[in-house]
């Protein structure tokens, strides 16, 4: 199985759907779904996902390289792994999504969207995770969902962590720092993301990794993400990652800007970078007689997008943690 990405993009089912790799067994579970199980017993399970948005190709290329290293035997596997290419049809078309944003649909929220390829795929991925986690006895469960951002950022690489009732484990946060993430953003409320689903339903330590900016296949400079690729390789093979890194800055979400109607106006232009700072009192958005302003001394914007569909998030506002 050295052509997982090509088969997924072409919509082709391989003639052989299971086999042996270098120290592990593999199973093709469907388009964009590949399970890897080490020959030796392990108590760690990992979801490695990318391509939830079809125009975010750099992480897909990174995963393809990791798979090549595993199948060539140059990289040892010490986790049970489910590799997920989230939205194959959008990846093939080179578009973010066909009908609706899948990363708003998880946790059963797909039922409130008009039926589409994305709603069907979200349901399929939920079932795939349920099967994967229920078929093993993993003591450790991680989910790393790799993305790229629509716009530029003051932090080239950053992580977004779902709301969680328990404290985050130190070794997980340390690995995120070793993977080159410059900032970590902590959600304070539930959401429809893939990582919130895996965290809430299966107790996984989950993070959305935002790596650079969305570009078409073949146009990505993957050298920007060498530190992340090296950390992923070390993780898969059970090697300790470097401890000589600057701890990521930490932010928490303090509010969400939502577009409710065509009267919505977001006062940020296309050049506004993620993590741009705004002073207290700054007018951020208006909709009819409703005004959204900065309420803390300083707030930072994340994922500003004035053109989202009505009812969806047009941006998050953050505050920096000590």
Swiss-Prot record:
What is the required cofactor set for this protein? Answer: Zn(2+)
Q: Does the keyword Metal-binding apply?
A: yes
Q: Does the keyword Ligase apply?
A: no
Which pathway does the protein contribute to?
A: Amino-acid degradation; L-arginine degradation via AST pathway; L-glutamate and succinate from L-arginine: step 5/5
- Write one Pfam family the protein is assigned to: AstE_AspA_hybrid
Q: Which organism is it from?
A: Salmonella heidelberg (strain SL476)
Textual note on the cofactor: Binds 1 zinc ion per subunit.
Give the GO molecular function terms: hydrolase activity, acting on ester bonds; succinylglutamate desuccinylase activity; zinc ion binding
Name the Gene3D superfamilies on file: Zn peptidases (3.40.630.10)
Q: What is its EC number?
A: 3.5.1.96
Q: Which HAMAP family match?
A: Arg_catab_AstE
Indicate what this protein is called per its UniProt record.
Answer: Succinylglutamate desuccinylase
* Gene for this chain: astE
Recorded catalytic reaction(s): these are: N-succinyl-L-glutamate + H2O = L-glutamate + succinate
What keywords tag this UniProt record? Arginine metabolism, Hydrolase, Metal-binding, Zinc
Taxonomic path? Bacteria, Pseudomonadati, Pseudomonadota, Gammaproteobacteria, Enterobacterales
**Mind telling me which PANTHER family this protein's record contains?**
ASPARTOACYLASE, SUCCINYLGLUTAMATE DESUCCINYLASE
């Amino acid at each position: 199985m050295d052509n997982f990405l090509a088969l997924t993009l072409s919509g082709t089912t391989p003639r052989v759907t299971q086999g042996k790799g270098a120290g592990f067994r593999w199973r093709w579970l469907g388009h964009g779904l590949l399970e890897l199980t080490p020959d030796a017993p392990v108590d760690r399970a990992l979801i490695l996902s990318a391509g939830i948005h079809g125009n975010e190709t750099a992480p897909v290329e990174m995963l393809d390289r990791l798979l090549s290293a595993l199948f060539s035997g140059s990289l040892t596997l010490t986790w049970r792994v489910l590799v997920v290419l989230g939205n194959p049809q959008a990846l093939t078309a080179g578009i973010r999504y066909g009908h609706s944003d899948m990363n708003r649909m998880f946790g059963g929220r797909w039922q409130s969207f008009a039926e589409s390829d994305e709603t069907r795929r979200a349901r399929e991925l939920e079932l795939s995770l349920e099967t994967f986690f229920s078929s093993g006895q993993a003591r450790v469960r991680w989910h790393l969902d790799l993305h790229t951002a629509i716009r530029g950022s003051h932090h080239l690489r950053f992580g977004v962590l779902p709301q969680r009732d328990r404290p985050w484990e130190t070794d997980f946060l340390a690995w995120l720092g070793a993977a080159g993430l410059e900032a970590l953003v902590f959600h304070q409320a539930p959401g429809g993301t893939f990582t919130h689903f895996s965290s809430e339903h299966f107790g996984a330590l989950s993070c959305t990794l935002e790596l650079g900016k969305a570009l078409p296949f073949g146009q990505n400079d993957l050298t920007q993400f060498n530190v992340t690729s090296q950390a992923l390789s070390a993780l898969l093979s059970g090697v300790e990652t470097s401890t000589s890194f600057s701890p990521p800055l930490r932010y928490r979400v303090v509010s969400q800007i939502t577009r409710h109607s065509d009267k919505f106006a977001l006062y940020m232009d296309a050049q506004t970078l993620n993590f741009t700072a705004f002073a207290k009192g700054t007018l951020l958005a208006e909709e009819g007689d409703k005004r959204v302003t900065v309420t803390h001394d300083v707030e930072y914007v994340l994922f500003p997008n004035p053109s989202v569909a009505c009812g969806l998030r047009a941006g998050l506002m953050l505050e920096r943690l000590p």
